């Protein structure tokens, strides 16, 4: 009874609450009705006000929800598309039914999950399964054989269009051919094209439908460091510990105070700690300022990317590729917040794992049906093996297993072939890449600009501008990449802070220039030139120049010269204006160093040679012997050949100061010193001349570089028929000559009067008598040729008839002795002979019928010939 009483009380209370709600709704309705009546009474508009309001309303444009922005801006002619775009085959219709059934089961089992992205509409508004939209294609360009180059091409070639609804996948998914034609698309279009190219190149690639961060979905790289600015880590070589020799000299005892050293080290460490703390605070402040604002849709933004699994193409580890930016990420990267499903050209998988920790804990074993639910049977991914207990349980009922196997075989369904046409990229499209030939990407404190080749007159294809601040207002440095330059310029690096310019060249420059570093193109300024040593005859590798010095480095010379350093003095001022070439800088000192010549003893092999030109001295230092500490040295006092009175100066021992490592082995006589002195004088002249030639070469290179920068001529391959003007003009001229020759041949073939006109003298005008004679000769000649042709056919006919009669007579005479093989040969011959006779008879009869008609037709043409019409019209 108590339970019944409680139920009655509950029902009464529910009825009271319902009545109260009904009364409240009635009051609200009355209140709204009264306010509407009041507002209606107070807002009566005049005719002018109504017209103004109508005009304002007509001016308002309401944006329509259409996520197929590619088609809306670049309409596609549906009539020119293949039938596979506009209709579905029976197999595709069956696949759509299977997909719908799969989606219903998934929604029933997982009601909290979003609907599956299975069969969006294509550009013809026909539903197509996502796996059939993939068209594996191997491009004919070797550059597109690797994943990084494929991703970079897709990122450069297409323009990103954001999803209309960032929380839902698009309702349309276009074919890659349409996307390539329009050169724009959303992230799903990007990933579909990239996945098709990667699968065609042999990668185990999949399109992913998931969730990404705000920067990833909007292709925002302003918080990412540009890959071109990341410097390669220098490998620090570890110094090998030298084992001290047993009898080596011990270092002197260190008498400094260890306490003072420790105090100094503590002080230095405190300064370092303060500096590190200050830098850490500055970095934290910058990171806090650059930190992105919290995204209210974090974890809900839909994004599509490409998954590449390890295994194929020697991929060691699975990774993600963002097709919008062509950057690769680890599968544990924080930019990727979750995965709903993924697919390739063979199957479709649903992620059954929890993504509470983004994608960090996901296991990409597509053969595990617990983690990845597949849609179609017969996938190429291996399934998990059964345990022994499961196998024993299955062995108990063999019939059920067989029936189950039959059912599975019946339920298996192969993926239909792709409905997309063959993906083709023309050489022009592959070369142009970027839409309209240009693309700009904004990175963190950097801006990257790309151009297609030959778009800029100077060959510029890429420019990277690095800035000091986050707002990109103060330029730090500029890097410019060039292609197809005649001067082989490849890269320009400009440092705006120091004003240093560095030009990099490919092999092939007229002066074998490799790197040119300078601050000014004026001569006798700070600059460094590096050369390709294998191209230079003199083995010059590097040349450093300052206003007062010039240093050259050599390799591989026959005289073993490795280094030359020239010191210049102040230039002597001349009254007349003179150029740098006519008034060179005076040389004060020349230092030359040589590599070891193994064919000479160390005491005779010069290691360093100094020409002190102003002091008139020459210093020599020889190579050091093995296991020796010091080396032999000599110094020559270079004097004039004659003194002030004109007397010849004789070589004296005081003019050569020498230090011998082993003076007892051999002593150099005065004659040897005199000959060495004369040889060094000649070598000094040669060194000064070579240094002067180096100065002239620098001036020549600077002049050449100025001309090259002003002209910036581009090279064009002989195989580029569109841009190569010389080749194009030559080809057009040849085609024109061939066409004219063909016309002449045709005219000669059709000119029936040509053989008769050739008999007349050249340039002579026709008379009436000659015209009539030409006409009669042409007709008589044609009549004779018709008669000759009839006689030829008649002669062949009579010959074939006589041979057949002879063969028949031979057969009648030898009929008794013939074998069956001979009879077969005879019958075959008779059949062929009768066929030839019949054909000749038909040709002869036809010729007799057509000969008069041909004669009359030629006669009519001659009467109408412009060369004879004025003379023979009287006789018509």
Curated annotation (Swiss-Prot):
GO terms for cellular component: cytoplasm; cytoskeleton; motile cilium. Keywords: Cell projection, Cilium, Coiled coil, Cytoplasm, Cytoskeleton, Differentiation, Flagellum, Spermatogenesis. Residues 387-407 have a biased composition (Acidic residues). One of its GO terms (biological process) is spermatogenesis. Residues 1-33, 258-295, 679-710, 784-809 form a coiled coil. Disruption phenotype: Male mice were infertile due to their short immotile spermatozoa. Axoneme formation and manchette removal are impaired in spermatids. No morphological abnormalities seen in multicilia of ependymal and tracheal epithelia and cilia motility is not impaired in ependymal cilia. Residues 17-40 have a biased composition (Basic and acidic residues). SUPFAM superfamilies: Cysteine proteinases. It comes from the Eukaryota. Residues 1-40, 385-412 are annotated as: Disordered. Its main location: other. It is found in: Cell projection, Cilium, Flagellum; Cytoplasm, Cytoskeleton, Cilium axoneme; Cytoplasm, Cytoskeleton, Flagellum axoneme. The keyword Cytoplasm applies. Abundantly expressed in the testis and is weakly expressed in the brain, thymus, lung and ovary. Expressed in ciliated cells. Component of the nexin-dynein regulatory complex (N-DRC) a key regulator of ciliary/flagellar motility which maintains the alignment and integrity of the distal axoneme and regulates microtubule sliding in motile axonemes. Essential for male fertility, sperm head morphogenesis and sperm flagellum formation. Not required for ciliogenesis in the brain and trachea. Belongs to the DRC7 family. Component of the nexin-dynein regulatory complex (N-DRC). Interacts with TCTE1/DRC5. Interacts with DRC3 and GAS8/DRC4. This is Dynein regulatory complex subunit 7.
């Amino acid at each position: 009874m108590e339970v019944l009483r409680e139920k009655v009380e509950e029902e009464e209370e529910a009825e009271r609450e319902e009545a109260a709600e009904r009364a409240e709704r009635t009051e609200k309705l009355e209140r709204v009705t009264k306010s509407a009546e009041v507002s209606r009474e107070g807002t009566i508009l005049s005719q002018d006000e109504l017209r103004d309001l109508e005009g304002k309303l007509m001016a308002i444009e309401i944006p329509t929800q259409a996520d197929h922005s590619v088609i809306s801006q670049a309409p596609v002619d549906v009539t020119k598309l293949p039938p596979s775009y506009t209709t579905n085959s029976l197999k595709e219709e069956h696949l759509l039914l299977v997909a719908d059934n799969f989606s219903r089961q998934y929604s029933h089992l997982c009601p909290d999950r979003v609907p599956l992205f299975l069969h969006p509409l294509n550009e013809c508004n026909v539903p197509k399964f996502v796996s059939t939209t993939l068209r594996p294609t191997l491009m004919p360009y070797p550059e597109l054989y690797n994943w990084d180059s494929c991703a970079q091409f897709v990122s450069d070639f297409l323009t990103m269009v954001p999803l209309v609804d960032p929380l839902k996948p698009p309702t349309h998914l276009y074919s890659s051919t349409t996307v390539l034609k329009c050169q724009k698309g959303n992230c799903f279009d990007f990933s579909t094209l990239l996945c098709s190219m990667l699968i065609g190149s042999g990668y185990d690639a999949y399109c992913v439908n998931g969730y990404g961060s705000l920067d990833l979905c909007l292709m925002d790289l302003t918080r990412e460091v540009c890959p071109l600015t990341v410097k390669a880590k220098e490998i620090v070589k570890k110094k090998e510990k030298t084992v001290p020799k047993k009898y080596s000299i011990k270092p002197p005892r260190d008498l400094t105070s260890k306490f003072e050293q420790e105090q100094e080290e503590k002080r230095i460490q405190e300064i370092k700690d303060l500096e590190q703390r200050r830098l850490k605070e500055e970095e934290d402040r910058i990171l806090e300022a650059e930190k992105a604002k919290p995204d209210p849709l974090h974890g809900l933004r839909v994004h599509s990317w490409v998954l590449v699994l390890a295994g194929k193409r020697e991929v060691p580890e699975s990774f993600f590729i963002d097709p919008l930016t062509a950057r690769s990420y680890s599968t544990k990267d924080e930019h990727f917040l979750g995965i709903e499903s993924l697919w390739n050209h063979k199957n479709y998988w649903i992620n059954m794992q929890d993504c509470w920790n983004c994608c960090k804990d996901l296991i990409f074993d597509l053969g595990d049906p617990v983690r990845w639910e597949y849609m179609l049977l017969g996938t190429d991914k291996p399934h998990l093996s059964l345990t022994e207990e499961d196998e024993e349980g299955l062995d108990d009922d063999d019939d059920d297993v067989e029936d189950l196997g039959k059912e599975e075989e019946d339920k298996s369904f192969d993926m239909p072939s792709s409905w997309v046409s063959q993906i083709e990229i023309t050489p022009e499209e592959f070369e142009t890449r970027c839409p309209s030939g240009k693309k700009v990407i904004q990175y963190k404190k950097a801006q990257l600009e790309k151009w297609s080749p030959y778009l800029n007159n100077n060959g510029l294809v890429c420019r990277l501008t690095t800035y000091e601040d986050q707002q990109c207002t103060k330029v730090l440095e500029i890097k410019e990449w060039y292609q197809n330059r005649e001067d082989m310029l490849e890269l320009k690096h400009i440092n705006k802070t120091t004003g240093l310019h560095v030009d990099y060249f490919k092999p092939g420059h007229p002066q074998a220039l490799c790197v040119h570093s300078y601050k000014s193109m004026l001569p006798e300024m700070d600059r460094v030139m590096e050369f390709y040593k294998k191209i230079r005859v003199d083995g010059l590798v590097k040349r450093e120049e300052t206003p007062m010095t010039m240093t050259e480095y050599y390799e591989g010379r026959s005289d073993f010269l490795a280094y030359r350093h020239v010191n210049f003095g102040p230039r002597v001022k001349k009254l007349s204006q003179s150029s740098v070439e006519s008034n060179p800088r005076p040389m004060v000192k020349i230092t030359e160093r040589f590599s070891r010549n193994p064919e000479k003893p160390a005491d005779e092999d010069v290691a360093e040679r100094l020409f002190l030109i102003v002091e008139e001295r020459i210093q020599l230092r020889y190579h050091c012997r093995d296991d020796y500490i010091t080396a032999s040295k000599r110094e020559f006092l270079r004097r004039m050949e004659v003194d002030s009175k004109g007397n010849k100066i004789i070589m004296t021992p005081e003019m050569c100061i020498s230090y011998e490592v082993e003076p007892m082995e051999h002593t150099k006589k005065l004659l040897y010193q005199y000959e060495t002195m004369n040889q060094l004088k000649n070598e000094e002249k040669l060194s000064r001349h070579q240094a002067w030639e180096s100065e002239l070469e620098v001036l020549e290179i600077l002049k050449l570089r100025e001309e090259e920068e002003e002209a910036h001529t581009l090279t064009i391959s002989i195989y580029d028929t569109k841009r190569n003007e010389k080749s194009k003009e030559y080809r057009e001229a040849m085609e024109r000559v061939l066409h004219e020759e063909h016309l002449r041949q045709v005219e000669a073939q059709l000119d029936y009067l040509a053989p008769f006109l050739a008999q007349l003298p050249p340039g002579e005008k026709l008379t009436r008598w000659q015209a009539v004679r030409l006409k009669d000769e042409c007709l008589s000649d044609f009549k004779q040729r018709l008669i000759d042709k009839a006689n030829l056919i008649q002669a062949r006919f009579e010959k074939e008839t006589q041979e057949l009669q002879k063969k028949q007579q031979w057969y009648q005479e030898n009929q008794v002795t013939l074998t069956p093989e001979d009879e077969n040969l005879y019958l075959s011959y008779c059949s062929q002979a009768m066929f030839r006779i019949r054909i000749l008879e038909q040709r002869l009869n036809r010729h007799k019928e057509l000969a008069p008609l041909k004669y009359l037709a030629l006669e009519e043409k001659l009467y109408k010939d412009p060369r004879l019409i004025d003379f023979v019209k009287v006789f018509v």
